[in-house]
Amino acid sequence: MRSLKQKKYRKKYRNFVVEGVRSIRSAFEDRAQFESIFFRDNFDTERIPQLKQVDRNIIYRVSDNTMKKLSNTSAPSGILAVSKLPEYKQFCPDENAIYLDGISDPGNMGTIIRTASWFGVQQVILSKECID
């Protein structure tokens, strides 16, 4: 799982890490295919009701120390998951789209995608130089 911090391994294994309550809730809403879900011993699973629908074989309760090792953040929220990369649909010239080039900050990318979604943009196309 640690290798998924690098873009080449995310591409190779077709997996990525989703971290935090809000992001995992959103992934559930988007019908993400989870490979594994990790949460700290003291994490309140009621915060994400969809966890009740997940195969118990992919859910792992871990110590704070293990969560810190798995997390990409300095202050882990207590839950993270490994999910399959979604299949991208073919470009459709009849739908509105934006093209992004050279976006390297994950926070900026998220803001742009959320804003585009709010404006009804249906396709986001990324250059190879963009963060994935």
Language-model regions, residue ranges each:
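Glycine/charged-rich beta-loop-alpha catalytic/anionic-binding loops adjacent to active sites
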Residues: 7, 61-62, 93-98
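A short, well-structured juxtamembrane/interface segment
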Residues: 21, 87-89
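RNA substrate-binding interface of SAM-dependent RNA methyltransferases
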Residues: 29, 91-132
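Short connector loops at helix/strand junctions that flank enzyme active sites
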Residues: 32, 74-76, 93-95
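Glycine/small-residue-rich loop that forms an oxyanion/phosphate-binding "nest" at active or ligand-binding sites
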Residues: 52-84
